[in-house]
Amino acid sequence: MRRFTTLLALLALSLVAVGGAVSAQRAAPVTSLTFCVDPTFPPMELTRSSGAIFGFDVDMAKAIAADWKISSKPVKTAFPGLIPALKSKKCEVVISGIFVTPDRLKQAGAVTYMHSHRVLLVRGGNPKKIAGPNDLKGKNVVVQAGTKYEEYLKGLKAKIGFSLQSYPGDTDAVAQVLIGRADVVLTQDTSAAYQIGQHPGKLQIAYLFPQQDSFGIYFRKSDTQLAAALREEVSTLKKNGTLAKLAAKYKLPVADVK
């Protein structure tokens, strides 16, 4: 009788173990974490000479995939096409230094993972003496196309008047300031910090906008299981210090990922 009871106990434990294994397998809401990304916004995402995409967002995607025991893969996509690509299922999520905004939330869901501020970036010494948005009047201003920065500048241009040119990537826009073709670029403090580090003495922040922006991971609204898993995972990566380590690695304010 005791032997029979012991066998039943072992059988029960084996079933629990199997059930646990199945649960672990089901913990990953997707089989592979494909993410649409525009690698023109360092240090969030950029491209090596080999063509490999890397940066804060790429490392974060890898960390998420590692916890889920699946692979991650970037899907290179032009910035204006990120949300459309998500909706057409070219990727499972968008992780690309993209703001969480009311307009985008009408099309997809999002999980916030970082906060930051917009800045006006100028040449070292600030030769045009730009101290705020109103000082853009009559200046040559550049920005990355398809961004909320561009949308904001178009509205401001209509009010005060200045030359505005848009470029495919943030790095392209910053380059115009470096070579003297533009007076100022509107970008994010994350990008500005990276560019200033890459070009010591040649660039500086002229103005930091007071309002806070939030970067988010976008997902299809119909993917409720993925949404729940992402919320839990981002919370975990914040609590265990993974995002803080990535912020330090890419010389970003650690407080932005708390």
Q: Can you say where each PLM-predicted feature lies in the sequence?
A:
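Ligand-binding cleft/hinge of the Venus flytrap
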Residues: 45-47, 61-70, 149-167, 196-200, ...
